Amino acid sequence: MINRDVYFDAVRDSMFEGSMSQQQVDGQNVIVALWDYQATGTPMTDIRWLAYILATVYHECATRMWPVTEYGSDSYLKGKPYYPYHGRGFVQLTWEENYRNAGIALGLIDDRDLVKHPDVALDSLIAARIMFRGMSEGWYTGRKLGQYFNDNEDDPVNARQIINGNDDDELIAGYHTKFLDALQGAMGRV
């Protein structure tokens, strides 16, 4: 389990210049709580995975740590070939097929059906579940967390390929290091 007080004290200084909004705290709480819940009996026991997930959210959501909608005006988004399935979430889910597949994988039906109600991907818990499954199972590019963080690999630079080629890979790897330091301290593993 991650000691939230220790974790937040560390990231507040290292990542958020001394203060965080309630939304930034809430978003991280959702992610860390889901991690704690899923870590039992699953491959998600390598804390480097969580550090990389948090680093990715920090980058993809422009430090907000909360699910976002793809940036752009309504007319811009309506011009996208995948509209109305434009980017939503902690990590941008796009295209109808991906909304459908994520919804099926997570068992989302009725008023939570992602195809009928794409804004459901902005719900913080659902966005976190999509991101965890997507990054661990290779939904975005075919690349998975386990390829970059395992007994033989520790590669936060190339892990960017899980989401988006190598754009800002060194920058995100630096975020990963800071989140990892905070998490290890919060677990008594310094």
Residue ranges and their predicted role:
Residues 33-35:
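Structured secondary-structure scaffolds
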Residues 38-44, 139-148, 187-190:
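Surface-exposed helix-capping loop/turn segments at secondary-structure junctions
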Residues 1-2, 190:
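N-terminal secretory targeting signals
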Residues 57-60, 146-168:
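Acidic helix/loop microenvironments that form the catalytic cleft of cell-wall polysaccharide enzymes
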Residues 128-151, 155:
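GST-like fold's C-terminal all-alpha helical module
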Residues 164-190:
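Low-complexity, Gly/Ser/Thr/Pro-rich intrinsically disordered linker/tail segments
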Residues 2-29, 39, 44, 48-135:
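Peptidoglycan-targeting cell-wall enzymes and recognition modules
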